[in-house]
C-alpha cells in the first residue's frame, strides 16, 4: 500500500518525456527533406562548438542577467517520501522549461511572431519574450520560462506538430521544451523541518536536498540524471533524433517510508502553535517517540516555514532545532542524575538526605529555586519539589568519574545518530579538562552548565521508559526500490540503567507528576515525567526573567507507548515549566490516548491492578 503512492507520484515524468519524444519524432519525419542537410552541417561543427561553448560561457546569462548552467537533458524524478501510512509528504511534480537558441531567429518579425504564440498557448508574456530574444541574440541557450504546466507544454507541442506540415520552418519550431521536475510538499508546513528542502546548486540546474530527510538521504533519493548534449547545433535541439541528442538513461530515485505519522505530526504542530500563542513563547519544539524502537512519530518546531516557498523564509528558520539547537535543559536533567544515583547504588528510592537549603560544591554555593531548606527528603520529594541541593548531593555521592560516565551512557555530548541532517553533539564538560571544575559536578547535576539537544533529552528519557536501552532514534522506517522494501531495524546503542532501576524510577516519576507536576496529568492514566525551567545564560550571567521550559514524560507508565518532549523558549505568560510546558504535554498526551485508542488504566488493567501498580 505504501509503495504505491511514490510510484503514482512519479508516473508523470516518464510519460511527459515519452509524449514529447513522440511529438518531436513526428515533426522530424515531416521535415525530413531539410533536416538531413542541416544535420550534416551540424555534425561537422558540433565538436568545435561544444569546446567553444564550454570555454567562453560555462555559465550563460538569461532573463535579468541571472546565471544558469547549460541545460542537461532528462532529469529523472527524485524519490518520493511518504509517512508510515502512505500519506505523500514529498514528491516531484513536472513542468516544462521553455528555451531556445536566439540566433535561429532572422529578424524582429520572427521574434514577435513566436512571442505572441507563446503568450497565447502558454501565457508567457510576449513583451518579456521579445525583449529576451532581442537582448541576447547570440546566446547558445536562452531560457524563456522556468516552468509552465504540462498542459501548456502540450499545447505548444501540438501547435509545433501542426506547423510542421506547413512549408518552410516556422519560428515556433525553434522552441525547445524540457520536462523539469520541481519538489512538491503537499502538506506544506507540516513536518517542514523534518523533511528539509530542495535547493539548486549555485550556477547549475542541478537540485540538491538540504537539511532534514532530504539532506541526510540526498544520495539515496537522488537519481543519476541524463547527461545531455549541451552545445548549440545548427538545428533546433527539439528536432534532433535521439541518437544525436544522446544521453544516459535516467535512473529514478528511491522512495522513503518514514516512521512519522502525519496525524501525530499534525497534533504536535497544532498543540505547539497553540502553546506559543497561549504562553507568548518565541519558539518551541515537540517530539513524540516510540520508546521501545526509537521510532520518531512526530517532530514539530515553531516558527516553521513552507518548503514549497522557503526562499521567503528566514534562513535561520530552515535548520531543525530538534537536532541542531542545543540548550541548558535545567531541572528536567534531574531525571538522568536520579537514574544514575539509583543505578550506581549510592542512594535508594526511599533513602532520605538532608536539605538545608544550600550546599557548597567547589567554589560555588548551590541554592534551591525557592531559596528554602526542606529537611529530610527522599528521591520522590526531591524530584517533585525539584531540589537542587539534593540533586547535587547525589552527584557528590557518585563522584565525578561515575557521574560523567552515566552522562555519556545516556548519550549526551555525542550525536544520537538520528538519520537527519544537521545534528549537533551538545556540550558536556569532562573532568581533567581546563574548562571543568568541581563546581560543575554540582551544577551539571541539575542541568546547568551543559547543553543538550531536544532529541538527546527525549531519547535519554526513552531509555528509562523502555527498561534501560538507549536506542538509535530514526525517522526512516523503510526504503523502497523497484518494489523491494528494506525495513530499518531498531538499533540498541547501549544500556543506561538496569531494568529494575528503570522500573523504580518510573514509579517515582509517576508520583512526581501526581504530586509536583499535576498540570501534566491526564485523568485516568498514570504518566511518568518531570518538568525543567532553565535560565538562559548570557555573557553577564543567567537571566532572571527569560527561560527555556521543558517537560518530558511517557505513558502509560506500565507499558509506555510514547515519549513526549515539550520545549518552549522564553514564554512570557509564565517563566515556569509547570505552568507552560507541562499542560502542553498533557494536551498532546490526551490526544494521543484518543488517537491510539488507549483505554484508561482502570479499563485496560482492571481496577485491582491499577491500584497495585
Segments (PLM) and residue ranges:
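Periplasmic/cell-envelope proteins involved in peptidoglycan metabolism and beta-lactam response
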Residues: 1-310, 401-411, 521-522, 537-542, ...
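Beta-lactam-recognizing serine transpeptidase/beta-lactamase-like catalytic domain environment
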Residues: 16-19, 90, 233-247, 260, ...
Amino acid at each position: 500500500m505504501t509503495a504505491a503512492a511514490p510510484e503514482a507520484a512519479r508516473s508523470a515524468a516518464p510519460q511527459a518525456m515519452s509524449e514529447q519524444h513522440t511529438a518531436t519524432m513526428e515533426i522530424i519525419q515531416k521535415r525530413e527533406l531539410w533536416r538531413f542537410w542541416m544535420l550534416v552541417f551540424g555534425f561537422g561543427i558540433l565538436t568545435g562548438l561544444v569546446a567553444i561553448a564550454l570555454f567562453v560561457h560555462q555559465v550563460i546569462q538569461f532573463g535579468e542577467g541571472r546565471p544558469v548552467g547549460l541545460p542537461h537533458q532528462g532529469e529523472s524524478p527524485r524519490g518520493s517520501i511518504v509517512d508510515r501510512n502512505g500519506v505523500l509528504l514529498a514528491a516531484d511534480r513536472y513542468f516544462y522549461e521553455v528555451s531556445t537558441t536566439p540566433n535561429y531567429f532572422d529578424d524582429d518579425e520572427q521574434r514577435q511572431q513566436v512571442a505572441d504564440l507563446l503568450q497565447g498557448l502558454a501565457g508567457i508574456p510576449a513583451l518579456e519574450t521579445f525583449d529576451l530574444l532581442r537582448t541576447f541574440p547570440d546566446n547558445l541557450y536562452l531560457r524563456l520560462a522556468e516552468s509552465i504546466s504540462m498542459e501548456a507544454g502540450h499545447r505548444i507541442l501540438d501547435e509545433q506538430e501542426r506547423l510542421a506540415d506547413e512549408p518552410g520552418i516556422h519560428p515556433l519550431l525553434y522552441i525547445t521544451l524540457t520536462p523539469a521536475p520541481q519538489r512538491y510538499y503537499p502538506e506544506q508546513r507540516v513536518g517542514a523541518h523534518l523533511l528539509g528542502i530542495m535547493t539548486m546548486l549555485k550556477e547549475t540546474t542541478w537540485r540538491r536536498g538540504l537539511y532534514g530527510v532530504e539532506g541526510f538521504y540526498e544520495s539515496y533519493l537522488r537519481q543519476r540524471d541524463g547527461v545531455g548534449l549541451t552545445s548549440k547545433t545548427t538545428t533546433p535541439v527539439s528536432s534532433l533524433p535521439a541518437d544525436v541528442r544522446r544521453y544516459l538513461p535516467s535512473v529514478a530515485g528511491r522512495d522513503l517510508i518514514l516512521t512519522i505519522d502525519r496525524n501525530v505530526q499534525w497534533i504536535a504542530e497544532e498543540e505547539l502553535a497553540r502553546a506559543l500563542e497561549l504562553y507568548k513563547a518565541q519558539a518551541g519544539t515537540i517530539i513524540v517517540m516510540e520508546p521501545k524502537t526509537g521510532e520518531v512519530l512526530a517532530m514539530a518546531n515553531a516558527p516553521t516555514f513552507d518548503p514549497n516557498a522557503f526562499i521567503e523564509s528566514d534562513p535561520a528558520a530552515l535548520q531543525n532545532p530538534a537536532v541542531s539547537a542545543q540548550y541548558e535543559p535545567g531541572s528536567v536533567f534531574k531525571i538522568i542524575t536520579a537514574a544514575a544515583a539509583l543505578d550506581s547504588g549510592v542512594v535508594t528510592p526511599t533513602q532520605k538526605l538532608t536539605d538545608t537549603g544550600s550546599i557548597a560544591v567547589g567554589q560555588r554555593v548551590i541554592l534551591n529555586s525557592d531559596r528554602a531548606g526542606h529537611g529530610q527528603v527522599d528521591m520522590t520529594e526531591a524530584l517533585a519539589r525539584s531540589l537542587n541541593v539534593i540533586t547535587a548531593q547525589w552527584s557528590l555521592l557518585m563522584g565525578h568519574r561515575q557521574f560523567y560516565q552515566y552522562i555519556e551512557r545516556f548519550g549526551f555530548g555525542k550525536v544520537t545518530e538520528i538519520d537527519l541532517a544537521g545534528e549537533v553533539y551538545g556540550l558536556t564538560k569532562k573532568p581533567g579538562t581546563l574548562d571543568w571544575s568541581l563546581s560543575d559536578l554540582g551544577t551539571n547535576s541539575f542541568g546547568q552548565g551543559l547543553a543538550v539537544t531536544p532529541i538527546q533529552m527525549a531519547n535519554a528519557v526513552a531509555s528509562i521508559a523502555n527498561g534501560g536501552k538507549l536506542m538509535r532514534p530514526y525517522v526512516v522506517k523503510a526504503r523502497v526500490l523497484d518494489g523491494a522494501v528494506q525495513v530499518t531495524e531498531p538499533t540498541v546503542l547501549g544500556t543506561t540503567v538496569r531494568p529494575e532501576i528503570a522500573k523504580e524510577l518510573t514509579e517515582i516519576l509517576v508520583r512526581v507528576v501526581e504530586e509536583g507536576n499535576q498540570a501534566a496529568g491526564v485523568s485516568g492514566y498514570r504518566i511518568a515525567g518531570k518538568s525543567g525551567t532553565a535560565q538562559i545564560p548570557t555573557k553577564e550571567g543567567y537571566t532572571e526573567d527569560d527561560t527555556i521550559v521543558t517537560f518530558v514524560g511517557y505513558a502509560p507508565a506500565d507499558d509506555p507507548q510514547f515519549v513526549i518532549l515539550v520545549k518552549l523558549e522564553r514564554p512570557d505568560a509564565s517563566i515556569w515549566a509547570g505552568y507552560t510546558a507541562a499542560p502542553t504535554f498533557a494536551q498532546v498526551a490526551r490526544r494521543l490516548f484518543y488517537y491510539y485508542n488507549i483505554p484508561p488504566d482502570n479499563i485496560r488493567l482492571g481496577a485491582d491492578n491499577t491500584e497495585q501498580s
